[in-house]
């Protein structure tokens, strides 16, 4: 249906159909992220020997995150007197919009994908980098030293880990022969790339955690050093924009790892009768659990250690993996 609409002449009907689909995607993702945050808090509570949210919405705290969202929407929207007002207002939008744009190319099943484009992997990596511009803009516009330091840290971290992230997936592109995410999943029908590209998987996972600014790489928001980092001066719904973009990317990156390394919706051998959507959900949940486990387990590292590890360790390993993959493909495939 979508392909037919894309090839048909432009009309107001097409506009309203795509606008409706975009709104549907927005609310579906926001609803999922809302309860995804609750799930993370519950898992962290379990790992730390706590109960977690249990006051709003019954003993399981099912409405806790909904209450948090309502609280943020009702809080006063304050803008510092010394801030650059236009940029201060624009920054959360710049950070927030790309987070939803990247989800359009993720194939959740062979039949459920919003946009099947030939360069889906390249599109995801390119668009996700725009968020850093919003983060740096927010830090600059706040006219606060802690916010500015947080924004500068975010930019330095993104530059340092974007390169290993891209290099780690070149091996997959060589093996699959495509940048299309659907074709990459189809190429893993017999064997998942986590077994063929274990080094690439480890490099991608570490670089992804750094890209997401999550522990142990959460230097842009380091509460013990920078109050709250680049969004120190933000409150209410503007702060919620930054928070939601972080969590949408969190779940988006988990989906991308599932597609690139875990075979997407492809089933385990002899269990093909289970629907592909179930397999995708199970793999996705495992990646999310692993990333939450990282957050609970590891302490924050120093800035110099972060930079040194990215440039001196991850990048050479990623380059060596490309060379080795090309050699194996040339000799055996």
Curated annotation (Swiss-Prot):
Pfam families: NADHdh. GO terms for molecular function: NADH dehydrogenase activity; oxidoreductase activity, acting on NAD(P)H, quinone or similar compound as acceptor; quinone binding. It is a multi-pass membrane protein. One of its GO terms (cellular component) is plasma membrane. Coiled coil: none annotated. It is found in: Cell membrane. The keyword Secreted does not apply. NCBIfam families: PRK06076.1-2 (NF004741). Belongs to the complex I subunit 1 family. This is NADH-quinone oxidoreductase subunit H. It comes from Bacillus thuringiensis subsp. konkukian (strain 97-27). The lineage of its organism: Bacteria, Bacillati, Bacillota, Bacilli, Bacillales. The gene is nuoH.
């Amino acid at each position: 249906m979508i392909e037919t609409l894309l090839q048909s002449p432009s009309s107001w009907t097409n506009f309203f159909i795509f606008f409706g689909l975009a709104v549907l995607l927005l609310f579906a993702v926001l609803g999922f992220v809302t309860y995804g945050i609750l799930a993370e808090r519950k898992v962290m509570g379990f790992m730390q020997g706590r109960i977690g949210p249990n006051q709003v919405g019954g003993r399981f705290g099912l409405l806790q995150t909904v209450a948090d969202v309502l609280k943020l929407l009702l809080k006063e929207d304050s803008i510092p007197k010394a801030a650059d007002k236009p940029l201060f207002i624009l920054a959360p939008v710049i950070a927030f919009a790309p987070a939803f744009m990247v989800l359009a190319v993720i194939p959740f099943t062979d039949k459920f994908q919003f946009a099947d484009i030939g360069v889906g992997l390249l599109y995801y990596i390119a668009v996700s980098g725009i968020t850093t511009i919003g983060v740096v803009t927010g830090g600059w516009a706040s006219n606060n030293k802690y916010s500015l330091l947080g924004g500068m840290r975010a930019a330095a971290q993104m530059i340092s880990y974007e390169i290993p992230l891209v290099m780690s997936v070149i091996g997959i592109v060589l093996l699959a022969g495509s940048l299309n995410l659907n074709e990459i999943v189809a190429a893993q029908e017999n064997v998942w790339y986590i077994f063929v590209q274990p080094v690439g998987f480890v490099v991608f996972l570490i670089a992804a955690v750094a890209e997401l600014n999550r522990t142990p790489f959460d230097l842009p928001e380091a509460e013990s050093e920078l109050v709250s980092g680049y969004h120190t001066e933000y409150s209410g719904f503007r702060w919620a924009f930054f928070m939601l973009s972080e969590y949408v990317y969190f779940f988006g990156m988990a989906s991308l790892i599932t597609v690139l390394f875990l075979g997407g919706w492809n089933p385990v051998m002899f269990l093909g009768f289970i629907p592909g959507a179930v397999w995708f959900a199970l793999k996705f949940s495992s990646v999310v659990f692993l990333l939450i486990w990282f957050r609970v387990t590891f302490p924050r590292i120093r800035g110099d250690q972060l930079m040194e590890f990215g440039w001196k360790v991850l990048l050479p390993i990623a380059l060596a993996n490309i060379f080795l993959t090309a050699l194996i493909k040339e000799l055996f495939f």
